[in-house]
């Protein structure tokens, strides 16, 4: 397995890995009923991931894991607060074709509040916003290996000592 920072020319590929991995994730699926056309949920998830991946790549905080030359996992890390302006500058306006601006901002605020709870309850240098593994490789140890051999060394290389994360899936806890 090879680990490295993602490149801007890989936004679509990395976003697809994230979208495939998180399509049924509760944080995302709860927004489906708020879409203008709920049947466009998959397209919305992909567009949202493109925004997040593009922003993370520009901040040098998107890592990928490659197996046999294919990206099979991605990690989006956060070291600083991301403003709504950052999202808008990285394509969030594209999301308005799927959801009203009010509902999208409510969703972003919900996610931000969840992250704020983590900030208030623990100290950490980096926040693992997302660890996505393509469905074929899920629950085969790829995510754990990526954390140990890719994400941890990256955090240490920046002078970081701790990593915070949130999950609402029991099977994600023991890595």
Where do the protein language model's features map onto the residues?
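Conserved active-site alpha-helix within GNAT-family acetyltransferase domains
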Residues: 157-158, 169-175
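A short beta-loop-alpha structural element at the N-terminal edge
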Residues: 2-29
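Conserved hydrophobic beta-strand within the GNAT/NAT acetyltransferase core sheet
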Residues: 128, 163-167
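Conserved acetyl-CoA-binding loop-helix of GNAT-fold acetyltransferases
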Residues: 133, 139-153
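Conserved GNAT-fold acetyl-CoA-binding loop/helix
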Residues: 26-49
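Conserved acyl-donor/pantetheine-binding loop and adjacent beta-alpha core of acyl/acetyltransferases
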Residues: 71-131
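Residue-level recognition of the GNAT/N-acetyltransferase active site
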Residues: 134, 168
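A short helix-loop-beta-strand connector motif used in the catalytic cores of GNAT acetyltransferases and
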Residues: 43-64, 123, 127
């Amino acid at each position: 397995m090879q680990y490295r920072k993602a490149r801007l020319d890989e936004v679509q590929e990395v976003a697809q890995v994230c979208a495939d991995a998180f399509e049924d994730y509760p944080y995302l699926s709860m927004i489906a009923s708020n879409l203008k056309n709920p049947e466009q949920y998959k397209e919305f998830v992909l567009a949202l991931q493109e925004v997040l991946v593009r922003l993370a790549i520009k901040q040098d905080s998107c890592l990928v894991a490659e197996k046999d030359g294919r990206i099979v996992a991605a990690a989006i890390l956060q070291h600083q607060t991301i403003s709504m302006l950052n999202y808008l500058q990285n394509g969030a306006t594209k999301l308005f074709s799927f959801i009203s601006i009010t509902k999208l901002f409510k969703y972003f605020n919900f996610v931000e509040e969840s992250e704020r709870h983590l900030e208030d309850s623990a100290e950490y240098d980096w926040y693992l916003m997302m660890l996505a593994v393509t469905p074929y490789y899920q629950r085969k140890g790829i995510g754990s290996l990526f954390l140990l051999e890719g994400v941890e060394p990256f955090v240490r290389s920046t002078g970081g000592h701790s990593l915070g994360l949130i999950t609402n899936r029991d099977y994600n806890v023991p890595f």
